[in-house]
A protein has these predicted regions:
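Anion-binding alpha/beta catalytic cores of soluble intermediary-metabolism enzymes, centered on
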Residues: 1-47, 51-234, 239-305
Length: 305
């Protein structure tokens, strides 16, 4: 179990440093996060973008960046393409999106000729440190699939389970969230949640326990589940919340950050490597946390949770 991002940092710090390819690295928060992780011995980096700006921002942050670690790219498209090439060439282990549109880097990732897609849907996982909750909490998918059907939700679950296995969890606990716990043909997400549970029981997602349909309060609070007579191994212990739509996930994550003071990491999974993907306006801390997650997923020491 990972209780918080400090726990995660400890695991990353005990592993061999990985290399991140940063597309459009000429951004203060992005570069600050990368440089801090590098100074701590957590990772190495290759910075792609406007070379002069990257070196200048580095100096502003008090760091003289070695020009040998910088690759100039005149456009966002060039930066994304070069970053993906570094993954294919084995020179980098994972990607980070810098000061560019999300669509630009994803277009390079899924390019059928030159990309790093693996022929299955990609999805986003927000990993949150929420005050009052005993461990890190995943929320998926609040960033990639707007209204997934059952097959889309299966891909989302599969990606999330693989991510948590890579983070060291032997048997992650998932809750397929709905407004209520009963299956109703009129509420399609309850039907899908029940189908996901059956798929998990059949071993479709690998080793995990998935409950659904289940409401948010029961997923996160064992006492609420006890009062309502809802018995499941996940109540009060959920590792991953599977939301019914991108909007639901996006709103939930932002509410936890704004009102509960949650800390976040954002990762896209389902390609040949994880992608640290945050809003361009995301804080230094969020981008740093995302690097930690990707570094551990990229081959750090694994431990049972």
């Amino acid at each position: 179990m990972l209780h918080n991002f400090e726990d995660l940092r400890g695991r990353v710090g005990s592993a061999e440093p990985k290399t991140v390819a940063v597309a459009c690295a000429h951004d203060g928060h992005t570069l600050e996060a990368v440089l801090r992780a590098a100074q701590e011995g957590i990772l190495r980096y290759i910075l792609i973008g406007h070379a002069d700006e990257i070196l200048s921002v580095g100096r502003t942050l008090g760091c003289e960046i070695d020009p040998a670690t910088v690759i100039n790219a005149d456009t966002d498209e060039d930066a994304a393409r070069i970053a993906v090439e570094l993954i294919l060439d084995g020179r980098a282990d994972f990607l980070q999106k810098g000061l560019m549109q999300t669509a630009t880097i994803l277009k390079a990732v899924v390019n059928k000729q030159t990309g790093i897609g693996i022929g299955r849907p990609m999805s986003h996982v927000a990993l949150l440190e929420v005050p009052g909750y005993a461990k890190l909490l995943g929320v998926t998918d609040g960033g990639m699939m707007p209204n997934p059907d059952l097959e889309g939700k299966k891909a989302i679950v599969r990606n999330a389970v693989e991510m948590f296995h890579a983070l060291g969890y032997e048997e992650p606990l998932l809750s397929a969230l709905c407004a209520a716990e009963n299956v109703s043909p009129k509420i399609i997400e309850t039907v899908d949640a029940a189908a996901l549970k059956q798929a998990a029981l059949g071993g479709e997602f690998g080793r995990c326990i998935l409950e659904g349909p289940i409401s948010l309060d029961l997923a996160l609070d064992a006492e609420s589940a006890k009062i309502k007579g809802y018995e499941s191994p996940v109540t009060g212990k959920t590792d991953i919340l599977v939301v019914p739509s991108m909007s639901a996930g996006n709103i939930m994550v932002k509410a936890l950050i704004e009102f509960a003071g949650a800390k976040m990491a954002g990762v896209v999974i389902g390609a040949k490597c994880p992608i640290a993907l945050n809003s361009r306006s995301a804080s230094f801390e969020e981008k740093y946390n995302s690097l930690l997650v990707c570094a551990l997923m990229s081959g750090g020491k694994r431990a049972g949770a």
